[in-house]
């Protein structure tokens, strides 16, 4: 039964500020960040610090700082990533050094299509080469038509080495036994990565307190800074070595390197591009004990690779015991793609940084980050009254990833202030590669990842930064039109293609032509519609109708012309043959279940825009749009015509029809059926971004429960890596057990997906090209409160906040965009709340709030009389990746808890006052859905205090512990029968269930614990410990006379 909250709107409205959200105090933030990193003051953590999901890693919620005391050398997952949208670099876990990976399970290989060695990477925006082929390909025979264009590296520019002589030096290979008091922090407010520790090399050379700080200047994007402090324990002599290491300059030809006015520089050009080069200059300053006059080039050192583009310069240092020595390295960089004279630009950049010095450089950098990524630009979970995060590990980690997602995406964009500072150089025009500027995973190519996964969440809150995506597609539009001439390379060679059409390749680098990795024809045609969606989003958030009409609508119309040309009649329907949907496990199929709706929507919108801009609609497009072929079986939308029930799915496909497509000819009932079916068919070896879409779709179409919250955790937690919450492409990084994938890292696609959940899921925002805001708020009960990041609609900033029952919208006090639609300057904005076929119209006034009711499906029971749905859950037992304990109470059978051990494992539900439910109620029975792998035995324990060892409590209950149910040799309600089961049939799976009716009602304690053991899905019990059983849902049934109404006391909205 849906709970009707006793919460009234009057207190909520009384606490709202009349003028909108308060502006962030950027001055105080800047001063605090500068103080923390100026090298004069000691870094001070706030009192609002929490333990993260990773041992030894803490999170400072007030300052947005991750700090680790754990050192993991030689592994790509622990490397820090630093970028400013123009230059980027990955550095070792022990300092700003170049690093080669150490083998794990014999593997040091990055993935398709390069299959190159894992190592630190550095590059500069747009630095793509041209080469005949790559080690992997989709259509290798296509290389005869022009070859590939993949990202090239540049010299690794951040190295600053302390060399004591006699082979004692500090770089990425330092022996960790010589290090103590290790800490490394990533300050996301300051944009500074830092390290501190004591290095005590073997012998009698004393010890050295070391601090490093690294940042790529966010305002002056041609500049970067490395700051080093050394405090020796005894007198001595050493050298400081300024290194530009050519080992990371992969796929380049050497141009030149030498000293120049005290600085050193190295220049390279990408393979096959003779008129493009990148120059990197580096110079150092030092405190009084650093002899800058002694600077000289050195060779043959083990920390400087023998690559031709490597160059290193040493300076002498005289140590005095306990006196700090400080060395600051300034870097200047430029390439021909953005600057006509890259050498002069890079030299000027390093000189200007040197003149500015560390403090002014740091301040300008921090100020720019504060203006771009202010407090209101990130989803916040802190209680508005206490300023603290809830005492819930999932929410704490969600708060961390909310900041990390935004930061890692933004550090791959260039803001308008930086563009202005660079005299309007073409800087924000190269979109996002899968790994950004710090990785050559997926060859640094641009995929649909940028348009569908990274752009939507970013463009809503940072429209100007996100222009990188649409600017890139606009830049390559002429080539996309030329690609139409290449139909001879595919099965459409005899098809008439409208000359106004355009087609983009699946992968894209410098040129945007059709290649072996980036086919145009007979592959993922949906990409072109994906690009169309990103153009619409940019328009809706910016209000810039002129840019859309003049630059983006022509692209959109060309995509419509493409779709109108390549479909063909199939009876009374239109279909597309020899294509691939987003699910790349099924290639060269017909009538893709996502692509066909994408074609329909694209054609419909194209005609709508034509009318809006005074052009004649295309009647054929209308006819096609209304009659695309979409096949269903047992209510499930098929991915392709020959699909059967054995098909596993690589990544989000049909679920994309619900969001982001928002397909008109698609009911909520069908969307729910598709959600439940494909959640069960999703491969565990699929990439990270998938589950974000399941979360958003579940929030939109599920009639009950809180699986959206489970999927939210699934969207990032199994993929996050210590220490800095960068996401991997895979849940398991070992290619020998994850289906053979060498995961991309960092996987910005995953960050982009997770970055959409809160705004498009919990708020239910949809960026539709009309004159209204569209939302459908539905905050899970586990989250007491969320303040959504400020989002833009038609150029106007909108703030929103939710508790469980209500959502408040109002115009933010932040300035509107320069492109804001002036029609809404002083008038109300229409707001539709709910699904399109059942939406309610509201109006957001120019001043003051709009309050709307949430869906509140978390308190609608999936299983009647369930007392514990969406209650707090905990477990101390290890569980399989993504198979969270919270799954057992989320009201959905498509999510599951699966402990890693088939020995006894326990999950505990808190029925106490945190959920507003009285603990005086009684239980009349239990319902279990075991999914496909029931346990052998199970027990239910009621208790009033937490149990340190629930398994031990089974044999020794104690005075406040009641064993309420014992199930042994659990009978399967639906055992697998190979004779009767048609594996080819497409239908939603039904799990094994058990229902227990108690002889008499039993009082429920504050806690209830389920203990399971064994796994009936295993072939046989051989005495070994295997993976545990599955629990899809556990319900405690309330009194037979009717369970008490669940009450959730909402957090007041300020």
Swiss-Prot record:
GO CC: one term? spore wall
Q: Look up the EC number in the record and give it.
A: 3.2.1.28
| Enzyme class, spelled out | hydrolase
Keyword Signal on this protein? yes
Residues annotated as the enzyme's active site: 584
Q: List the disulfide bonds.
A: none
Catalysed reactions, as listed in the record: alpha,alpha-trehalose + H2O = alpha-D-glucose + beta-D-glucose
Gene3D superfamilies, per the entry: 1.50.10.10, Glycoside hydrolase, family 65, N-terminal domain (2.70.98.40)
Q: Which UniProt keywords apply?
A: Glycoprotein, Glycosidase, Hydrolase, Signal
tRNA-binding: present as a keyword of the record? no
Return the protein name: Acid trehalase
Q: Which organism is it from?
A: Emericella nidulans (strain FGSC A4 / ATCC 38163 / CBS 112.46 / NRRL 194 / M139)
For this protein's source organism, the top of the classification is: Eukaryota, Fungi, Dikarya, Ascomycota, Pezizomycotina
């Amino acid at each position: 039964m849906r709970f009707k909250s006793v919460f009234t709107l009057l207190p909520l409205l009384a606490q709202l500020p009349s003028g909108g959200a308060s502006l962030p105090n950027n001055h105080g933030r800047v001063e605090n960040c500068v103080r923390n990193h100026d090298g004069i003051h000691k870094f001070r953590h706030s009192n609002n610090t929490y333990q993260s999901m990773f041992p030894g890693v803490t999170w400072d919620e007030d300052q947005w700082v991750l700090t680790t005391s754990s050192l993991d050398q030689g592994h790509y997952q622990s490397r820090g990533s630093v970028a400013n949208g123009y230059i980027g670099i990955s550095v070792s876990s022990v300092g700003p050094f170049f690093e080669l990976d150490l083998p794990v399970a014999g593997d040091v290989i990055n993935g398709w299509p390069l299959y190159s060695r894992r190592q630190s990477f550095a590059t500069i925006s747009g630095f793509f080469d041209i080469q005949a082929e790559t080690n992997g390909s989709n259509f290798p025979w296509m290389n005869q038509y022009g070859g590939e264009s993949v990202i090239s590296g540049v010299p690794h520019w951040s190295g600053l080495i302390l060399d004591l002589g006699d082979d004692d030096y500090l770089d990425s290979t330092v022996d960790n036994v010589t290090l103590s008091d290790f800490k490394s922090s990533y300050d996301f407010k300051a944009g500074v990565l830092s390290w501190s520790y004591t290095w005590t090399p073997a012998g009698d050379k004393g010890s050295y307190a070391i601090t490093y700080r690294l940042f790529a200047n966010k305002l002056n994007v041609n500049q970067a800074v490395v700051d080093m402090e050394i405090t020796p324990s005894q007198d001595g002599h050493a050298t400081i070595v300024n290194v530009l290491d050519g080992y990371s300059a992969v796929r380049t030809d050497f141009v030149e390197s030498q000293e120049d006015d005290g600085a050193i520089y190295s220049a390279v050009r990408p393979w096959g591009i003779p008129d493009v080069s990148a120059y990197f200059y580096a110079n150092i300053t030092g405190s009084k004990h650093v002899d800058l006059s002694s600077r000289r080039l050195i060779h043959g050192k083990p920390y400087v690779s023998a690559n031709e583009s490597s160059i290193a310069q040493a300076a002498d240092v005289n140590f005095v015991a306990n006196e700090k020595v400080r060395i600051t390295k300034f870097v200047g960089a430029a390439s021909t793609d953005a600057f006509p004279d890259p050498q002069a630009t890079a030299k000027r950049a390093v000189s200007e940084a040197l003149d500015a010095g560390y403090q002014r450089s740091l301040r300008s950098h921090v100020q720019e980050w504060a203006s771009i990524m202010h407090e209101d630009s990130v989803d916040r979970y802190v209680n508005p009254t206490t300023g603290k995060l809830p005492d819930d590990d999932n929410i704490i980690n969600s708060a961390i990833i909310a900041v990390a997602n935004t930061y890692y995406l933004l550090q791959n964009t260039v803001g308008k202030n930086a563009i202005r500072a660079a005299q309007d150089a073409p800087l924000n025009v190269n979109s996002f590669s899968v790994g950004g500027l710090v990785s050559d995973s997926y060859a640094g190519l641009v995929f649909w990842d940028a348009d569908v996964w990274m752009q939507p969440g970013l463009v809503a809150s940072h429209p100007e930064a996100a222009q990188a995506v649409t600017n890139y597609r606009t830049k390559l539009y002429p080539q996309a039109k030329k690609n139409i001439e290449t139909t001879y390379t595919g099965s459409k060679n005899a098809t008439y293609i409208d000359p106004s059409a355009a087609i983009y390749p699946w992968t894209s680098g410098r040129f945007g032509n059709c290649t072996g990795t980036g086919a145009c024809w007979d592959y993922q045609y949906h990409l072109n519609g994906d690009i169309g969606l990103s153009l619409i989003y940019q328009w809706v958030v910016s209000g810039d109708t002129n840019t859309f009409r003049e630059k983006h609508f022509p692209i959109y119309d060309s995509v419509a012309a493409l779709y109108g040309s390549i479909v063909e009649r199939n009876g009374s329907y239109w279909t597309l043959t020899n294509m691939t949907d987003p699910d790349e496990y099924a290639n060269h199929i017909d009538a893709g279940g996502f692509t066909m709706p994408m074609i329909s929507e694209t054609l419909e919108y194209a005609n709508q825009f034509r009318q809006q801009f005074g052009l004649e609609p295309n009647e054929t497009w209308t006819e096609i749009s209304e009659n695309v072929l979409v096949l269903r079986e047992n209510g499930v939308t098929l991915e392709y015509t020959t699909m059967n029930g054995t098909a596993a799915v690589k990544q989000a496909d049909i679920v994309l029809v619900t969001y982001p497509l928002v397909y008109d000819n698609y009911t909520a009932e069908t969307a729910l059926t598709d959600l439940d079916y494909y959640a069960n068919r999703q491969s565990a070896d699929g990439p990270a971004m998938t589950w974000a879409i399941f979360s958003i779709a579940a929030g939109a179409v599920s009639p009950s429960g809180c699986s959206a919250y489970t999927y939210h955790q699934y969207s990032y937690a199994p993929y996050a890596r210590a220490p800095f919450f960068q996401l991997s492409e895979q849940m398991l990084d070992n290619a020998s057990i994850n289906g053979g994938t060498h995961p991309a890292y960092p996987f910005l696609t995953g960050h982009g997906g997770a970055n959409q959940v809160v705004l498009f899921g919990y708020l239910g925002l949809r960026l539709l090209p009309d004159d209204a805001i569209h939302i459908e708020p539905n905050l899970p009960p586990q989250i007491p409160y969320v303040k959504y990041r400020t989002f833009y609609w038609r150029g106007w900033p909108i703030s929103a906040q939710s508790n469980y029952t209500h959502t408040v919208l109002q115009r933010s006090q932040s300035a509107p965009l320069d492109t804001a639609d002036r029609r809404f300057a002083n008038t109300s904005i229409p707001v539709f709340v709910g699904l399109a076929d059942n939406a309610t119209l509201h109006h957001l006034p120019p001043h003051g709030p709009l309050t709307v009711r949430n869906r509140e499906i978390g308190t609608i029971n999936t299983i009647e009389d369930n007392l514990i749905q969406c209650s707090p859950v905990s477990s101390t037992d290890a569980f399989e990746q993504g198979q969270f304990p919270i799954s057992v109470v989320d009201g959905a059978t498509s999510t599951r808890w699966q402990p890693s051990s088939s020995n006894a494992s326990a999950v505990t539900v808190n029925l106490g006052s945190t959920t507003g439910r009285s603990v005086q109620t009684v239980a009349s029975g239990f319902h279990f859905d075991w999914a496909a792998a029931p346990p052998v035995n199970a027990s239910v324990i009621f208790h009033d205090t937490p149990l340190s060892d629930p398994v031990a409590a089974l044999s020794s209950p104690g005075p406040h512990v009641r064993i309420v149910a014992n199930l042994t040799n659990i009978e399967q309600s639906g055992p697998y029968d190979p004779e009767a089961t048609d594996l080819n049939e497409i239908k939603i799976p039904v799990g094994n269930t058990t229902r227990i009716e108690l002889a008499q009602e039993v009082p429920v304690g504050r806690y209830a614990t389920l203990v399971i053991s064994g796994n009936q899905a295993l072939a046989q019990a051989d005495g070994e410990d295997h993976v545990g059983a599955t629990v899809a849902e556990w319900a405690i049934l309330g009194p037979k006379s009717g369970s008490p109404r669940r009450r959730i006391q909402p957090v007041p909205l300020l």
